[in-house]
């Protein structure tokens, strides 16, 4: 058993263009200047856990630093704080519970410098929409509620009521069609 913060940890983390630069203390060595093309403190912790798993798999020797750097530089996580457009910046995140929404909010607050944040939100009916909105409320200026074509999608009218109870009705808009909601967000 290895424990984060005891046998391994993220020693340093700096925001970098397109991700973050890490130094990770593994079980067998310290790995520095690791570029991770993902955003968020939680992604750095995930990277450290992955590194330690690979170290454990290969036994009692340090990993080749060049292989570690190349491996992490090639990492992708589609739909997780993924920058899909610039000017205006559009970030796609598939947070589907309050914990994921908190990680998104922390990342947006600490790693980006936006003057205004407009969130386009659609939620499945079996998810904690109130909890998701409560985590986003401190950092989001306006919310556009929508729904996907999935049969599991919460109707946008229901989501509108929930969002309005958290944000206030003056900060929430309903656009039931997802593509139209995205168009509205980038036009505003």
Model-derived features: where do they sit?
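Short, acidic/turn-prone active-site loops that include or flank metal/cofactor-
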Residues: 6-8, 122, 147-152
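Short, surface-exposed acidic
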Residues: 2-4, 63-68, 171-172
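C-terminal helical cap/extension that packs against the catalytic core
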Residues: 17-22, 89-92, 98, 133-188
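Nucleotide phosphate-binding/pyrophosphate-handling subdomain across enzymes
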Residues: 20-142
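Short beta-strands and strand-loop turn motifs
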Residues: 4, 114, 144-147
């Amino acid at each position: 058993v290895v424990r984060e913060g005891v046998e391994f940890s993220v020693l340093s983390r700096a925001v970098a263009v397109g991700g973050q630069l890490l130094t990770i203390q593994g079980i067998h060595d310290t790995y520095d200047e690791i570029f991770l093309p993902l955003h968020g403190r939680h992604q750095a912790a995930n990277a450290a856990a992955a590194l330690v798993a690979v170290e454990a798999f290969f036994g009692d020797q340090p990993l080749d630093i060049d292989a570690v750097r190349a491996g992490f530089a090639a990492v992708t996580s589609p739909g997780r704080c993924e920058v899909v457009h610039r000017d205006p910046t559009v970030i796609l995140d598939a947070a589907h519970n309050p914990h994921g929404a908190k990680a998104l909010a922390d990342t947006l607050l600490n790693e980006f410098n936006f003057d205004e944040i407009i969130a386009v939100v659609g939620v499945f009916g079996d998810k904690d929409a109130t909890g998701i909105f409560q985590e986003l409320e401190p950092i989001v200026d306006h919310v556009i509620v929508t729904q996907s074509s999935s049969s599991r999608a919460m109707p946008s009218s229901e989501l509108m009521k929930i969002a309005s109870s958290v944000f206030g009705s003056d900060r929430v808009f309903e656009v039931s069609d997802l593509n139209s909601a995205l168009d509205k967000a980038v036009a505003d």
